[in-house]
């Protein structure tokens, strides 16, 4: 046999071993949809951006959402179930988008800029609240 060749029997064994290992492969991010629960444990590669709910650990009846685990990172310790996250626009962001389109139609030959800032604040009861701040400015273009 050459240096890069295996006997037929050993080659078949290696192929079947690789096929068996594929069964342990984690779900790929493209197969996971928002809301799916993903179980991860030590050594697993995070298949998608996930949000942590620690209420099962603390015994609280209401979900306690923590920071995100990012796709491609690895689990160093522990085991948990996490939910897939999705970046969605808030109703205010959707309205700002509609207002921008309307403003561009109405203003026609005028230059219009709309800046939107999203600010996250912590309320008195330790919950997050989003505040949207929109600032617009326009300039008329002389013909």
UniProtKB/Swiss-Prot annotation:
<keyword id="KW-1278">Translocase</keyword>
<comment type="function">
    <text>This magnesium-dependent enzyme catalyzes the hydrolysis of ATP coupled with the transport of calcium. Transports calcium ions from the cytosol into the sarcoplasmic/endoplasmic reticulum lumen. Contributes to calcium sequestration involved in muscular excitation/contraction.</text>
</comment>
<dbReference type="InterPro" id="IPR008250">
    <property type="entry name" value="ATPase_P-typ_transduc_dom_A_sf"/>
</dbReference>
<comment type="similarity">
    <text>Belongs to the cation transport ATPase (P-type) (TC 3.A.3) family. Type IIA subfamily.</text>
</comment>
<keyword id="KW-0472">Membrane</keyword>
<keyword id="KW-0020">Allergen</keyword>
<dbReference type="GO" id="GO:0046872">
    <property type="term" value="F:metal ion binding"/>
</dbReference>
<keyword id="KW-0479">Metal-binding</keyword>
<keyword id="KW-0109">Calcium transport</keyword>
<keyword id="KW-0106">Calcium</keyword>
<keyword id="KW-0812">Transmembrane</keyword>
<keyword id="KW-0813">Transport</keyword>
<keyword id="KW-0703">Sarcoplasmic reticulum</keyword>
<keyword id="KW-0256">Endoplasmic reticulum</keyword>
<keyword id="KW-0406">Ion transport</keyword>
<dbReference type="Pfam" id="PF00122">
    <property type="entry name" value="E1-E2_ATPase"/>
</dbReference>
<protein>
    <recommendedName>
        <fullName>Sarcoplasmic/endoplasmic reticulum calcium ATPase</fullName>
        <ecNumber>7.2.2.10</ecNumber>
    </recommendedName>
</protein>
<dbReference type="GO" id="GO:0005388">
    <property type="term" value="F:P-type calcium transporter activity"/>
</dbReference>
<dbReference type="GO" id="GO:0033017">
    <property type="term" value="C:sarcoplasmic reticulum membrane"/>
</dbReference>
